[in-house]
Amino acid sequence: MDMDVMMISMCILASTLMAPGWASTSGFLRVPQSQSIVENEAADFGCEATDPASYLHYEWLHNGREISYDKRVYRIGSHLHIEAVQREEDVGDYVCIATSLASGAREASPPAKLSVIYLESASVQLLGSNRNELLLKCHVEGASGDEPLQIEWYRDSARLASWGNVHLEEHRLLVRQPSPSDDGLYRCTASNAAGRVMSKQGYVYQANIKCLPRLLKKNQKLPESWGKQTFLCRGKRGGSGGLDQALSPAPEDLRIVQGPAGQLLIKEGDSAALSCLYELPAELQNQRIQLRWRKDGKLLRHVELGGAIPIPGHAHDSGKDALLREDARLVLHKQNGTLSFASIIASDAGQYQCQLQLEGHAPLNSSPGLLEVIEQLKFVPQPTSKNLELDAAVAKVHCKAQGTPSPQVQWLREGSLNSSLPDQVEVDINGTLIFRNVRAEHRGNYTCQARSSQGQISATVSINVVVTPKFSVPPVGPIETTEQGTVVMHCQAIGDPKPTIQWDKDLKYLSENNTDRERFSFLENGTLEIRNVQVEDEGSYGCTIGNSAGLKREDVQLVVRSTGDGFAPEETGGDGFLVTRAVLITMTVALAYIVLVVGLMLWCRYRRQARKARLNELSIKEAGGDQPDASVTNGKGSEQEPCLSKQRNGASGKPKSKSNGDAQKSDDTACSQQSRSSKKSVYEQLVLPRSGLSELLQIGRGEFGDVFVGKLKASLVAASAQSDKDADTEKQHSNSENGSGGSGSGSGSTTLSTLNEKRRSKTSMDDIEEIKEEEPEQSALEQLVLVKALNKVKDEQACQEFRRQLDLLRGISHKGVVRLFGLCREKDPHYMVLEYTDWGDLKQFLLATAGKVNTATATSSPPALTTSQVLAVAYQIARGMDAIYRSRCTHRDLATRNCVISSEFVVKVSYPALCKDKYSREYHKHRNTLLPVRWLAPECIQEDEYTTKSDIFAYGVLVWELFNQATKLPHEELTSEQVIQRSQAGTLEWTVAEATPDSLKEILLSCWLANPKERPSFSQLGSALSKAMQSVAEK
């Protein structure tokens, strides 16, 4: 049936192409299609028409207006490309217009609609609440194109479904006859192709019904004063009223003498302290007492006061929001209960309350205090200069300012009387400068002023009125000439500023320097003249005109006939010959197209049958083996992995080329791919069961997903070690059989299905709840691990970075580099499981020893590291990085935050890369990528070139962090943009830390030399550190 439909459509196409006359035979081989694109992603509209008699010129219209091309929106041949789609500018209808250069006939394609998919925020709205029903709505700021938004509801941490008295309908949640079992915090999540967001604030529901008494657990001890007939009243998570009523009040001699009462007004950037003076009786010294600080009802910081074992968790807080992440600005002093802020930011504003919690008793609360922050007056973002198109209907320049109180924004024009704005220029209530019917007199400098009680700030922008370049005399072709003749190609343009004209041949620029000056002449008006034409001059010539308003291009074909052919334009056959030639060409193209389509259909059918046969054979083999492959067990074959490599390693021993056209620059810039003779791919050999993980705790978010700390069964750790040993043995055996110069046959490639990418991969609460906790007696049989989830399965850049980190760590076996235990890929999201230590990352350890992190249980901060200890840490990291270099790999993000340290003072190079929250201050978005610009060498920022020498540069910054105890950032007096500018200009100066030994200063300074070849190697650094440790030990 499909073959018949295809044959009929091809016949119709052939008959259309062979009809005489372009007006009647005009048609589009390819028309632009409507599409929905995620904001900031690229969009492409295809357009291709046919005209047998002449060449065609293409134009594009957006909402009825001709498109002005620039660096973001430009034309590739006849197709339209939009680099980063913006919903405010690019939404609408797009039409392709094809014009015949011979007859001047024009034809327009059907309009194609572009819809932008975006997702900003979600919130829970209460529509109705009474005894009979509870009705909530999930309000979402976003759009999903033709696909509906996916809404999910959660009560506390449990996902809800339509069952029992709970009904879900589109964006609404209805609970009929609510009871105490329905109490809790209700939140919603919305997801589409642009991502997934959760409502920042939910709705807390608590039924006005007393909780039912239940029998106590067996052998549970209670005070004798409570009496024999005692029942336990269990409340729902998220509601504290019922639980507090079931607990006895706190002892009277346990008091909070002074709390954070009143209102505290602090300027942004200043320090602040909230007091909580308490009295702790002697008889309660050994009791479990916890001092807590809450902000807006949410737990912020806590510390143990009594001498008993610290309380690992409390059921009363299990339903609350998660604790704030580690923040060096906040310090809770155990001695007096004071909560101090090193530097106030705007988000610190809120209501604060301190609390004493004695186990078995209701919490003792202080009076609440209000902290208000005076936000500094600033522009968000800074206004920028702009080019406006002449006669544009509307043009806008934004100016937004923030501060306390809210500032007033005003625009002024320099050089005019009273600094007034010209006609048809106005300012709206948001501070946006609006130009209507842009004219030449609107050109000039404009100043945006923001005023408040804090003072005044201003920013000046330059407004330039430009005219898009247009062809006054476009090149016309094709041009046919004889050898040794003369050809003149006209190309003249108008615009403001005056456009420049550039000629190219076959996409290679032409100039007086790369052409024969005796034959090629570039006239002042843009005309190109070629004298004594040669056969090699034949080709496609393009004329590009451009100014600050945009670029335009026209192509012309030059055909050179040899004098031996007896060609003369006036002696060619009449119109009959041209028509016959056009018909023959059309029939040949149509026939070739039909043959190609039929061949592709047969080839695809053969590939499907071959793939099905391979999968069946693999399933049979794996079913009889000791360890079935995860892809076969999953029932979906190896096509389940859209983000991992689609090819298996061959046995040739040759490295594979990198994807996305990113050429391999040197041995230092990419990991060499080691060959394996195993039938399984390298990723299948890393498979770990997801059930082997337990007690996952999220510690942050990285570039491609969430990052957790958890535990892995010791049996799986041993199996992973044995697998690595077997792989090395197999590799040695393969090398002994094939020899160094031998080459084996490569394994077949496996096509991977992308059905999983129809939904957005995200780490959900259900995935974490599937990993059940182990019994306490099994904790000794578990290994602490770091788990990195791949959530962005549709982001090719994130998938490529995930594969790069896998290839980096799987090929290294060294005590100075963390182990890669395996890969959980039974379902999305994939988990990368790495070795972790009991003391965590090195930066937090350095901050703790410097007294910058609240240790909670300790009476005082740990002592600072000695010089010999710092040198030992630097030496271990240098050994680990030397192992990475010998594996022909690069790290690309070496810093103390990406190293881990154990209680045995063993330091290893790792890769947590928590760039989205915990260490977001140490990364900066440059060229649409988050980069640690303060640790990067100049060649990494300018040319995106990563080598071992760039890792040497980062290692020098790491040693600087070690001797400064990681208490400050490199060049913290500069902004990230200033660091980038000075690094590119070569004016960024580096100095070693004051505590650095004299013997190391010279080699550490050489790590930051501008020429990468002059920087030392890791082996040289290790030798220098070893000598420095010996000299320090002798002293």
Swiss-Prot record:
Residues 1-23 form the signal peptide. Residues 658-676 have a biased composition (Polar residues). The gene is otk. The keyword Phosphoprotein applies. Keywords: Cell adhesion, Cell membrane, Disulfide bond, Glycoprotein, Immunoglobulin domain, Membrane, Neurogenesis, Phosphoprotein, Receptor, Repeat, Signal, Transmembrane, Transmembrane helix. Glycans are attached at N336, N418, N430, N445, N513, N525. Its main location: membrane. This is Tyrosine-protein kinase-like otk. Residues 24-109, 110-199, 251-365, 368-464, 469-559 form the Ig-like C2-type domain. Residues 24-582 are extracellular. Residues 723-734 have a biased composition (Basic and acidic residues). Residues 693-1029 form the Protein kinase domain. Residues 766-775 have a biased composition (Acidic residues). The modification Phosphoserine is found at S681. It is found in: Cell membrane. Residues 623-683, 721-775 are annotated as: Disordered.
